[in-house]
Curated annotation (Swiss-Prot):
This protein's name: Large ribosomal subunit protein uL5
Native source species: Sulfolobus acidocaldarius (strain ATCC 33909 / DSM 639 / JCM 8929 / NBRC 15157 / NCIMB 11770)
The entry's keywords: Ribonucleoprotein, Ribosomal protein, RNA-binding, rRNA-binding, tRNA-binding
Functional summary from the UniProt entry: This is one of the proteins that bind and probably mediate the attachment of the 5S RNA into the large ribosomal subunit, where it forms part of the central protuberance. In the 70S ribosome it contacts protein S13 of the 30S subunit (bridge B1b), connecting the 2 subunits; this bridge is implicated in subunit movement. May contact the P site tRNA; the 5S rRNA and some of its associated proteins might help stabilize positioning of ribosome-bound tRNAs.
NCBIfam families: PRK04219.1
């Protein structure tokens, strides 16, 4: 056995990008929601879905079940390409508090016009958005599938440190304290 074979890493321990979810919460239905739908479709190239209000809040004029936002999920290569497109909007910097203990990363973009390659369209207006990144290891499907579900041991889950290292190595992200 040579030295290179001994140093091979276990493929099941690799951290992989599962999905990127883009969300715009408008807070109301109507014309503004349609514009947000159009914007997410332009940015991602995927047909978005409407998010609905979970409960009625009279002060905000939100009804339970009424569409109040738009989201789109990107997987595989489309997710990587989208991340490379939006990370310059935050100057390739993420706060340490953006990472949770389960391999998820979230950050917000204040105005969509900060994304390189997008222009201001007076008909659409300006929207902020949330970008959520989910990192997993091979074998996570056993937790989600319908038949023969099984739990994943804690040692196989993606930790905060592993998520930070993944983002540093693959997307050249600088991590800020706080």
């Amino acid at each position: 056995m040579s030295m290179q074979e001994a140093k091979k890493e276990n493929v099941m321990r690799r951290v992989v990008l599962d999905k990127v979810t883009v969300n715009i919460g408008v807070g109301e239905s109507g014309e503004r929601l349609q514009k947000a739908y159009q914007l997410v479709q332009e940015l991602t190239g995927v047909k978005p879905v409407y998010t609905k209000g979970r409960k009625s809040i009279r002060e905000f004029g939100v009804r339970k079940g009424a569409p109040i936002g738009v989201k789109a999920t990107l997987r595989r290569q489309a997710a990587v390409e989208f991340l490379k497109k939006v990370l310059p909007a935050v100057n390739f910097r993420l706060k340490q508090s953006s990472f949770d203990n389960y391999g998820n990363v979230s950050f917000g973009i204040a105005e969509h016009v900060l994304i390189p390659g997008t222009r201001y369209d007076p008909e659409i207006g300006i929207f902020g958005m949330d970008v959520a990144i989910t990192l997993v290891r091979p074998g996570y499907r056993t937790m989600k599938r319908k038949r023969k579900k099984a739990s994943i041991p804690r040692r196989h889950r993606v930790t905060k440190e592993e998520a930070i290292n993944f983002m540093k190595e693959n997307f050249n992200v600088t991590i800020l304290e706080g």
